[in-house]
């Protein structure tokens, strides 16, 4: 198997792990995914005009800060979260690309969707660079007030 095919297979495994994780049950499962798939010296750019997150430990901390409120709203407030991805064929063969959508739905039926694209570079079967771009948002904001 050539290097590009191996990276593509690793990317498929990572994407499948992300979509299988259940935020209502645990946010820690996402941190375990970081441990399993990301290099110690990973660099992640979460959007334009944002400082890169450098290192697996910082990525774990950043991810936990983001996921804990979502986990609480899902576990206690009835927030439903679904995550989907579509692989994007790479033109250069060096990176992997995918398009993601996370849909948040509260019990009243209010829904908000977030979309973004991801570019990854792999080294030794670990992500060592990831960039999120082309962010899109649809639907009204969801906050704790909407659960009343």
Task: Give residue ranges: language-model regions.
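A generic structural motif
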Residues: 45, 103-107, 133
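Short, ordered coil/turn segments that flank beta-strands lining enzyme active or ligand-binding pockets
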Residues: 40, 107, 123
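Short, low-complexity N-terminal intrinsically disordered segments enriched in polar/charged residues
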Residues: 1-32, 36, 40, 148
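Short beta-strand edge/turn micro-motifs at domain boundaries
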Residues: 113-146
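Hydrophobic/aromatic beta-strand elements that line small-molecule binding cavities or substrate pockets
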Residues: 80-89, 102, 115-123
């Amino acid at each position: 198997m050539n290097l590009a095919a191996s990276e593509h297979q690793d990317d498929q495994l990572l994407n499948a792990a992300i979509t299988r994780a259940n935020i209502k049950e645990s946010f820690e499962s996402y941190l375990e995914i970081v441990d399993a798939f990301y290099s110690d010296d990973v660099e992640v750019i979460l959007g334009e005009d944002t400082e890169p997150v450098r290192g697996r430990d910082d990525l774990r901390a950043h991810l936990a800060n983001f996921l804990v409120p979502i986990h609480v709203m899902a576990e206690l407030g009835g927030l439903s979260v679904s995550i989907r991805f579509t692989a994007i064929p790479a033109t250069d063969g060096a990176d992997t690309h995918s398009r993601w959508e996370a849909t948040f739905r509260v019990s009243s039926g209010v829904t908000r969707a977030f979309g973004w694209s991801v570019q990854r570079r792999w080294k030794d079967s670990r992500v060592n660079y990831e960039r999120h771009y082309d962010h899109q948002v649809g639907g009204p904001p969801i906050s704790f007030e909407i659960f009343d």
